[in-house]
C-alpha cells in the first residue's frame, strides 16, 4: 500500500479516492494526513473549517486501514476525508449554529447522517462555518468569526453552508454535508464554483440537525444535502445519506427513479432567466443563455415560457411568510408569529403549487434558473437584510428579493442541483440551478454531471 498520497489525488473525486483506498493504491491515513495538511496550509485566511477534529480523524483513518488489511473493503466513501456543517451534531464536538449562547453545547451522539457517513467509511476532519441560526448568505458569527470566498477574500462564500463551500473550492476536501432552506446549499455552491444538491423534501433524515435547546423536530421546508467539488459525488453521497430513519425505516425502503433521460439528447428543458419578484444581472442571464445553446447543440429541447408554470410571485410571497415563521422559531431574541389559520392557508397554497409543478414536469424534464441574481457579493457587517442592497447591472436591488430564486424549489419540496457554468467579468463563479420533479433527484444530478463534462471538454 502506498502511504504517501499521490498529488493527483489532491483534486480527485470522492469516488476516485474511495476506489484508491479500496484497491490499496493509497492508505486512508495518507489521504487523511494530506487533507489535514491542506487545511493547515490554506485555511488561515479563509476560516472555513472552524471546528477541527484531526486526532479522531487520524484514529478513524488508522481503523479504516486496519479493516482493509483484514479484507473488509466495504463502504462507498471508504477512507474519504470530508467535513460537515457546524450545525450537525457530532459527538464530542460543539454545535452552536453560530450563536454565542450555545457555545458550550456539546452533543453526546452523532446526527443520523453523520453516522451514515462514518458507516460508509468517511473520515470526518471537522465542521465548517455558518451564520447565526443558519440565517444569512454569509458565514460569519460571534463564535467562529468570518469565512471569506477563496476566489476573492473581500466577498462572501455564501451561507449558510458557506464554510463547506469555501473548503471545497479551496481544495481542502472533496465532500461536505450541508443543509438548505433558503438556498443554503445552492447559493454557496454558486458563489464558490462547486456543486451542491438540495434534495427532495424529507428524502434525507434530519435527526441530529436541530437548534440546541429544541426537541429536535424536523424543520418544515429544510433539507439536508451533499456538496462536492465533482458532480458525480453528489449522487455517491445521496446513495449513502438518503432513506428513512427511525420508525419509518420499519416499513419503508427508498427506490429513487433513474434519470429521466440518460443523455442530454432529447432532454426537455424550461429555461427561466426572469422572475416577477427578483432580478438577475446580465452576466448571470448570459451564462444561462450560453448554457442553453450548448444543450441545444447536444440535442436538448429548450423552451423559455410555459402556460403550465405556477404563479411565481404568489409562490414567493407564501414561501417568504412560511420561511420567516420557521426560521425565527427557537432563535434568541424573538420570533415572527402567525395564526394557525394563516399557517394552514400556507399549507393549502403549497399543496396547490405542488400539483402545478407536477403538471409542468409532465411536459418538461428539468427547469433551469439562476441560483442567485449575481455572483458573490462583497462582505457586509450590516445584520438587517432590509438595510442591505445588491448592485445588479449597476442598479440597487433589494437583498431579500433573491430568496425568490431558491424559493421556487424549496416551497414545493423539489430537488435542485447547483452547478458551476461560467465566470463573471470579475472572475467569480456563476452557477445554474437545475430543478426537477419531486423525487427525481437523480435527474438533476445527472444533468449537472453532463454539464460538468461539457465544460471540461
Functional labels for PLM-detected ranges:
Residues 1-59, 297-299, 457:
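An N-terminal boundary/leader segment
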Residues 5, 77-97, 263-272, 301-303, ...:
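Short helix-loop capping/hinge segments that flank enzyme active sites or metal/cofactor-binding pockets
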Residues 16-23, 102-105, 222-229, 334-335, ...:
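Short, well-ordered beta-strand elements within core beta-sheets of diverse protein domains
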Residues 25, 29-33, 40-102:
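N-terminal, positively charged, Ser/Thr/Ala/Gly-biased leader segments
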Residues 28-33, 62-65, 282-306, 343-364:
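Acyltransferase
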Residues 35, 57, 79, 85, ...:
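Conserved hydrophobic/aromatic pocket- or pore-lining residues that grip, position, or stack substrates
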Residues 41, 119, 170-270, 275, ...:
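Structural helix-boundary/capping segments
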Residues 77-224, 272-274, 371-393:
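Short glycine/serine-rich loop/turn segments
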Amino acid at each position: 500500500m502506498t502511504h504517501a498520497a499521490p498529488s493527483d489525488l489532491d483534486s480527485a473525486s470522492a469516488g476516485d479516492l474511495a476506489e484508491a483506498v479500496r484497491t490499496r493504491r493509497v492508505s486512508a491515513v495518507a489521504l487523511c494526513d494530506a487533507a489535514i495538511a491542506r487545511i493547515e496550509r490554506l485555511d488561515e485566511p479563509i476560516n472555513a473549517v472552524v471546528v477541527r477534529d484531526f486526532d479522531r480523524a487520524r484514529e478513524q483513518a488508522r481503523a479504516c486501514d486496519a479493516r482493509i488489511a483484514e479484507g473488509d473493503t466495504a463502504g462507498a466513501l471508504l477512507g474519504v476525508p470530508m467535513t460537515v456543517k457546524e450545525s450537525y451534531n457530532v459527538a464530542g464536538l460543539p454545535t452552536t449554529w453560530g450563536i454565542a449562547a450555545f457555545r458550550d453545547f456539546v452533543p453526546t451522539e452523532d446526527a443520523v447522517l453523520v453516522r451514515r457517513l462514518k458507516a460508509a467509511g468517511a473520515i470526518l476532519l471537522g465542521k465548517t462555518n455558518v451564520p447565526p441560526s443558519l440565517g444569512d448568505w454569509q458565514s460569519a458569527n460571534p463564535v467562529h468569526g468570518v469565512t471569506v470566498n477563496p476566489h476573492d477574500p473581500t466577498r462572501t462564500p455564501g451561507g449558510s453552508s458557506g464554510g463547506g463551500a469555501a473548503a471545497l473550492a479551496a481544495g481542502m476536501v472533496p465532500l461536505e454535508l450541508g443543509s438548505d432552506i433558503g438556498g443554503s446549499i445552492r447559493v454557496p455552491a454558486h458563489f464558490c464554483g462547486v456543486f451542491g444538491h438540495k434534495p427532495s423534501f424529507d428524502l434525507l433524515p434530519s435527526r441530529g440537525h436541530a437548534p440546541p435547546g429544541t426537541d429536535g423536530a424536523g424543520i418544515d421546508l429544510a433539507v439536508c444535502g451533499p456538496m462536492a467539488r465533482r458532480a458525480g459525488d453528489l449522487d455517491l453521497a445521496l446513495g449513502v445519506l438518503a432513506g428513512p430513519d427511525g420508525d419509518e425505516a420499519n416499513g419503508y425502503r427508498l427506490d429513487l427513479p433513474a434519470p429521466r433521460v440518460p443523455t442530454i439528447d432529447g432532454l426537455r428543458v424550461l429555461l427561466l432567466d426572469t422572475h416577477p419578484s427578483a432580478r438577475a444581472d446580465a452576466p448571470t442571464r448570459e451564462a444561462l443563455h450560453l448554457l442553453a445553446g450548448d444543450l441545444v447543440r447536444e440535442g436538448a429541447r429548450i423552451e423559455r415560457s410555459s402556460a403550465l408554470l405556477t404563479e411565481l410571485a404568489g409562490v414567493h410571497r407564501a414561501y417568504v411568510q412560511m420561511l420567516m415563521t420557521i426560521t425565527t422559531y427557537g432563535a434568541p431574541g424573538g420570533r415572527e408569529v402567525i395564526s394557525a389559520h394563516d399557517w394552514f392557508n400556507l399549507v393549502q397554497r403549497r399543496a396547490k403549487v405542488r400539483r402545478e409543478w407536477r403538471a409542468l414536469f409532465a411536459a418538461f424534464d428539468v427547469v433551469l434558473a439562476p441560483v442567485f441574481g449575481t455572483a458573490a457579493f462583497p462582505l457586509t457587517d450590516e445584520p438587517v437584510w432590509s438595510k442591505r442592497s445588491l448592485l445588479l447591472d449597476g442598479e440597487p436591488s433589494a437583498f431579500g428579493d433573491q430568496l425568490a430564486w431558491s424559493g421556487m424549489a424549496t416551497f414545493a419540496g423539489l430537488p435542485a442541483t447547483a452547478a458551476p457554468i461560467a465566470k463573471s467579468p470579475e472572475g467569480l463563479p456563476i452557477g445554474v440551478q437545475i430543478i426537477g420533479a419531486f423525487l427525481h433527484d437523480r435527474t438533476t444530478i445527472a444533468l449537472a454531471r453532463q454539464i460538468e463534462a461539457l465544460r471540461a471538454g
